[in-house]
Amino acid sequence: MAMKKEVMSSERLAASLAIPDMTDPKNGIHAINLVVENVNKALRNAYAEAVFEEIRTSPKVPEKENFDDLLFPSDNAGRSSRYTRYVTPDTVLRTHTSAAIPGWLRNAAKGGRLEDTIVVLPGLCYRRDVVDKTHCGELHQMDVWRIRRGNPRFNRPDLIHLVETILGSVVPEYKYRANEVKHPYTINGLEVEVLVNGGWLEILECGEAHPTVLENSGLDSCEYSGLALGMGLDRLVMIVKGVEDIRILRSEDPRIKRQMVNLDKFVVVSDQPATKRVLSYSTSTDKTEEDVCEEIRDELGQEAVYIEEIQYSEMLYEQLPSKARENLGIRPDQ
């Protein structure tokens, strides 16, 4: 079965690219770029012997760079336009900042400048996702890779040290746990979660750079080894500031915006409870949950920021009483 690759409309593309990347101080001081700054300082201090590079790249990337160069299989579900935004049949809005790493590795290998280098790549990523308090379609991410030539080769203790260096710079007082997980472009991978309000929240994934990624980039994997880490900056800021809803980070409310220029604890600006409404929405039976969430956001336009969560509970035409069918104007294929 062919992978679904629907190209996004030019209007949706323009709207996506118009969203400011808050990892970049050029777009104004924000808690997100303050976290990036703290992480960078910690890395420079902890690994003073390594060359440090921060890079930024276009969010529009070839599908090959987003998936193939990072060893994602051709049938990986993430390639589908159910989850990924296609600009053309062969170009996507990056789903992770890791998409730029193989290209950086190739350029570094050609330049012969890789001895011991840490490269960081913060930026905005784009995914088709469901709507809830910890997920959004446009997320801030940051990759941290360290590539070294010769011995000693990087191993699990080195990876844990990198994780703890980053966590110590942002959320030092929080307990974390690391779970074994597989990633296409790493070996000995880990998923790291932080304990927040009695529950575990995933904030980063990491591992040792896959030898094949190094080889395909022009680096001899017998000579080079690496560490790879990608973190969700929005969630880190939520933890630091005590924010429970990811939408708050981009709020235009002046009372909230004033609080987003530092890493102080967030002060709730309203003591009113959330308003709940049950709304019926008719759509074709072949639509996924991600499709429905995106359609609703499109219909609401700027007012979509008021949506806290969409709970998906489907009921087919045949299951509805005749009066409900009449009120909804629903068709048999919906």
Locate each region found by the language model.
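Generic alpha-helical secondary structure
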Residues: 28, 32-36, 152-163, 285-293
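A carboxyl-terminal module marker
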Residues: 179-334
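Extended C-terminal subregions enriched in glycine
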Residues: 154-190
